[in-house]
From Swiss-Prot:
The chain crosses the membrane at residues 15-35, 38-58, 60-80, 92-112, 128-148, 168-188, 204-224, 549-569. Belongs to the CN hydrolase family. Apolipoprotein N-acyltransferase subfamily. InterPro entries: Apolipo_AcylTrfase (IPR004563), C-N_Hydrolase (IPR003010), C-N_Hydrolase_sf (IPR036526), LNT_N (IPR045378). It comes from Leptospira interrogans serogroup Icterohaemorrhagiae serovar Lai (strain 56601). Pfam families: CN_hydrolase, LNT_N. The active site is at E285, K355, C446. Pathway: Protein modification; lipoprotein biosynthesis (N-acyl transfer). CDD domains: ALP_N-acyl_transferase. This is Apolipoprotein N-acyltransferase 1. Keywords: Acyltransferase, Cell inner membrane, Cell membrane, Membrane, Transferase, Transmembrane, Transmembrane helix. The gene is lnt1. Its EC number is 2.3.1.269.
Length: 576
């Protein structure tokens, strides 16, 4: 009936499908998280691809270009403002960059469609689509570059039960699952009147597979909660702060009143007001911008070292007996690093992780060597140098730690006083005697947490992480939708690894999830100032299948499906 009014080859029909993908995407992602919206987006994609198969490949690519911009404006409309604030460009450049971003970030549709087109599936009622469509979509998710990555698997966030499949196949496995569910739905709709047909029976078999995956999700949600190590539980008490300070633009770097107000706010929030002190204090990215705590000649020369910032970190640890996780900038052989640092109360030493995945045009300027004039356009862009290796941060929980006030709170800008106290041999010996356990943190700085590959490489070594901590600064984007989309994408890392995940954002949303991706606290909302004190269990029994094998099996499976189909198509064409 629908096709009596709108032709499958018409511009209107294709525009409706493009908007169907865009609207389905925005409502499939957080904060809406409608599972049906994700299915709607993928079904719209199927029908768009079939419509494009009836035109030339160049016209099809033109439509995919249109799709990329429709997706931009429906789901990621916050990007132009973010570009302007992060890099300091004017409105014209930010809009121009927005269009370019849409093309680059949605290149996966070009690969997705190309693989689908050459698979020669001429109808949504063909059972080949059950595997070809998911394999092509998943492979394009895994291969193509994205700036702020979103995957088809992110659109399944409306079902916490289906999301548990990520513990086996990761977010890419969820991409395959969503596209498989959508394909199965289409076959069922087409053949539900023909129950004796081969196609209907195939769709029922697919439905049984989906039911098994759902059953696994239910089992995992119940099993994880009962599989904690009760003999030697490792409970870590944490204080997380969200100061909601304004973005540290370069013109504020020399503003003493701004820096003083920012540091005071962080300091006042991080001093616990309850009797039981935390074992770990988590301070988000850029809570204290521009500065670091390494008192080196090059840091002093570039005015990066801040004695007050170091004094605050030392004071907090001394006052609470806690380790302190925070973000800082430091020069290392003339290379400016963006770091996650852990100050350890046990010995007064600091471990540091250098951020490996930098934000283009925000933290570094691509092609700056070839086009130096870009620096005059993107004036707020930083000059960070990426780290080379993953690094776990090892903290310690010490028994019988009591909160007390160190002397001379007025001397925060003279950290030597506090440094001396941490060097006491007697105190250090007592702490070692009272050491309850050590714990390992997998640090993720800002949008690094959106890339599953950056998490997987931590599981290749003997020492495994026990908790994931993502400290981030979303204040640059000034968009509640972005904050929710970012947070929703990060949550999957907890399910993939089977570990609790703490997300501490300077302006929101700050959340904590257990190994199933289920919230453990009431989140601190967007542009709220607040703290959360909570306890997490660190005694995961075993690694997930995904952390042991990664994406290897999914790569092989998808490639074999597509190669088999292409061989089959080429044989048919040769015979004809």
């Amino acid at each position: 009936m629908f096709y009596n009014f709108i032709s499958k080859d018409s511009i209107l029909y294709r525009l409706i499908l493009c908007f169907g993908i865009g609207i389905g995407t925005v409502f499939g992602l957080s904060p809406f998280s409608f599972f049906s919206a994700g299915v709607f987006a993928s079904i719209s994609c199927i029908f768009l691809f079939f419509s494009l198969n009836r035109t030339s490949i160049w016209k099809a690519f033109l439509w995919l270009l249109i799709l990329s911009q429709i997706l931009n404006f429906t789901a990621f409309y916050w990007i132009p403002g973010a570009i302007s604030r992060i890099s300091g460009v004017n409105t014209f450049v930010s809009i121009l960059f927005f269009f370019l971003y849409g093309l680059i970030s949605h290149l996966k549709f070009f690969l997705f469609y190309t693989l689908f087109r050459f698979s020669k599936i001429d109808s949504a009622s063909k059972t080949y689509i059950l595997l070809i469509f998911p394999a092509a979509g998943t492979l394009s998710d895994m291969i193509t570059f994205q700036i702020f990555p979103w995957y088809w698997g992110n659109l399944i966030s409306g079902s916490i039960v289906f999301e548990q499949f990520a513990s086996i196949c990761g977010v890419y496995g969820l991409s395959f699952l969503l596209l498989f569910i959508s394909s199965t739905f289409l076959i069922l709709v087409n053949y539900y009147k023909y129950k004796n047909s081969k196609e209907f029976k195939t769709s029922i078999a697919s439905l049984i597979c989906i039911t098994f995956i759902y059953g696994f999700g239910l089992y995992r949600i119940g099993y994880i909660n009962q599989s904690q190590n009760e003999l030697k539980p490792k409970n870590l008490s944490v204080l997380m702060i969200q100061p909601d300070t304004s973005p540290g633009t370069k013109d504020l770097k020399a503003d003493a009143s701004y820096l003083s107000a920012t540091m005071s706010k962080v300091f006042s929030l991080a001093i616990p007001t309850f009797e039981n002190s935390p074992s770990l204090i988590v301070i988000p990215e850029s809570a204290i911008p521009f500065h670091g705590t390494i008192d080196s000649e090059e840091n002093r020369k570039e005015k990066i070292y801040s004695s007050t910032m170091e004094g605050i970190i030392l004071y907090l640890s001394k006052h609470t007996g806690a380790d302190v996780l925070f973000n800082e900038l430091n020069l290392d052989e003339n290379k400016l690093r963006n770091q996650v640092s852990l100050f350890k109360n046990l010995d007064g030493k600091t471990e540091r992780y250098n951020k490996r995945r930098l934000l283009p045009f925000g933290e570094y300027l691509p092609m700056e060597k070839n086009f130096p004039f870009l620096r005059s356009i993107f004036q707020e862009t930083s000059r960070y140098v990426p780290g080379e290796f993953p690094k776990l941060l090892i903290g310690n929980k010490i028994q019988n730690q009591r909160s007390f006030l160190p002397p001379e709170i007025s001397k925060l800008n003279e950290p030597k006083t506090y440094r001396y106290e941490f060097s006491s041999i007697v105190e250090h010996t007592n702490k070692i005697r009272n050491l309850e356990y050590s714990y390992s943190i997998l640090p993720l700085l800002c949008y690094e947490a959106m890339f599953t590959e950056l998490v997987l490489d931590y599981f290749q070594n003997e020492q495994k992480p026990e908790v994931l901590i993502n400290i981030t600064n979303d204040s640059w984007f000034d968009s509640e939708l972005e904050a929710y989309q970012h947070s929703g994408a990060v949550r999957l890392r907890a399910i993939e690894t089977g570990l609790p995940l703490i997300r501490s954002a300077v302006s929101g949303i700050s959340e904590v999830w257990d190994a199933r991706g289920i919230p453990m606290i009431v989140p601190i909302g967007f542009h709220e100032t607040g703290t959360r004190a909570f306890s997490i269990r660190l005694d995961a029994i075993e690694s997930t299948i995904y952390t042991r094998f990664g994406n290897s099996f999914l790569w092989i499976f998808c490639i074999l499906i597509l190669i088999s189909r292409l061989i089959f198509v080429s044989r048919i064409e040769r015979k004809s």
